[in-house]
């Protein structure tokens, strides 16, 4: 009842996997899973690098937008 803590639970799970997929298919599945994880980690790393570079451009855009909005407000107040 405590979950998958017993070695026998894992043996049964392994046997079911072998019966479902066959012994020849398991290495292919493991290889596909490994390459999927590798691609996922690479994508996360690339996104983190882009995020480090991105705030510089966003800050500049925010400053320009605030300056534009404040000039519009002043022109409306003068009218």
UniProtKB/Swiss-Prot annotation:
One matching Pfam family: TatA_B_E
GO cellular component: TAT protein transport complex
Membrane topology, from the record: Single-pass membrane protein
One GO term of the biological process aspect: protein transport by the Tat complex
Residues passing through the membrane, by range: 1-21
Top-rank lineage group of the source organism: Bacteria
Chief subcellular location: membrane
Function text: Part of the twin-arginine translocation (Tat) system that transports large folded proteins containing a characteristic twin-arginine motif in their signal peptide across membranes. TatA could form the protein-conducting channel of the Tat system.
The family this protein is said to belong to: Belongs to the TatA/E family.
NCBIfam families linked to this entry: tatAE
Oligomeric and partner information: The Tat system comprises two distinct complexes: a TatABC complex, containing multiple copies of TatA, TatB and TatC subunits, and a separate TatA complex, containing only TatA subunits. Substrates initially bind to the TatABC complex, which probably triggers association of the separate TatA complex to form the active translocon.
Protein name: Sec-independent protein translocase protein TatA
């Amino acid at each position: 009842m405590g979950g998958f803590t017993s070695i026998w639970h894992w043996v049964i799970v392994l046997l079911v996997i072998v019966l479902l997929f066959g012994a020849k298919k398991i290495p292919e599945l493991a290889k596909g899973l490994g390459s999927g994880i590798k691609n996922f980690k690479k994508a996360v790393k690339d996104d983190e690098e882009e995020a480090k570079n991105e705030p510089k451009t966003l800050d500049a855009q925010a400053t320009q937008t605030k300056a534009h909005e404040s000039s519009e407000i002043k022109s409306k107040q003068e009218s």
